Structures are given as structure tokens and as C-alpha cells.
Amino acid sequence: LRVLITELNRSASHLVGMGAYGLDLGTFSPFLYAFREREKLLDLFEEVCGARLTYSYITVGGMTADLPPGWLQRCEAFLDQFEPVIREYHTLLTTNAIFVKRTANIGVLSSEMAIDYGCTGPVLRGSGVDIDLRRDGESIYTAMYDGYAFEVAVMKNGHYPRDHEYPAVPRL
């Protein structure tokens, strides 16, 4: 359950980033779509703990309360509709002429340079280095994800828009 809540929170965070990034680059629709999906996630969080943004549901030793009746089914229904729309959003954003014009060949960071600069997390993986603390680290997160198989989004060319062959929006 902790992994599920944590991953849903991560998705909500990435939706904000994706929407705001598109907005900064002149594409308004992806912002609205991303925030629509984020609202659905925040509704699920509110059901679980009464808060939408600053929830304190995960605590030492477990969770602060049981799930409300039917919550897992509502969460599963959300995830069933979420997966296909993420593919749509990816296409809507990364094939947008304005987005492509403003991002192509901008901010390329080689894996060597990323390591030399001490980059971590998504920036390091975006530069082609396959390291993820959920899988490779020694922390509470590694223990929490132990036994779960998941694909880590690692870009090949140091820049997301040139990795068009990568399916969907990798972090979501």
C-alpha cells in the first residue's frame, strides 16, 4: 500500500511538471489535461486521509488508517483510464510543433557530463545513466520496492525529445 500511495503521489507530481512545462513552452492543452488527471489523483488521496496535498498517510510502521471501502476499486478504475490518456498526452505534447521547435537540441547533457557535474535522479537517467535509488540504493525506498519489478525510464541520447521511440511518458 505504501508503494501504491507513493507511486500515485509521484505521478501527481509529474503531471504538474508535465503540464507546467508544456505551458511554459506555449502549449496550453497539455496543462489542462494533466491537471484534470491530477485532480482525480488528489480526490483519491483526500478519500484516504482527508487531505489533497499535504497528506500524512504513510507513517513509521505502516499507515495511519485503513483504506475506505471501495477505494482500491476506484483507484484501479482510475489507473485503467489513466494509462491510455498518458499516451495521448505524450503525443499531444511531443508532436506539438511549438514544443519541438523550442526543445530540439536544447539542454543536451551527455552521461559523462552529468556524472562529472554530480547530477542525480531524473537528470542523470535523462542523460542515459541507468541508476534509480528505488532499485539500486540502500535506503527505506529500496526496501519498500524490494520484490517489485519495474522499468526505469532511461533516455538514450541525453535529451528526451530525441528519444521518440521510448513508449509513453516514461516517468508516469
Walk through the language-model features, giving the residues of each.
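Active-site bordering "gate/hinge" segments
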Residues: 1-172
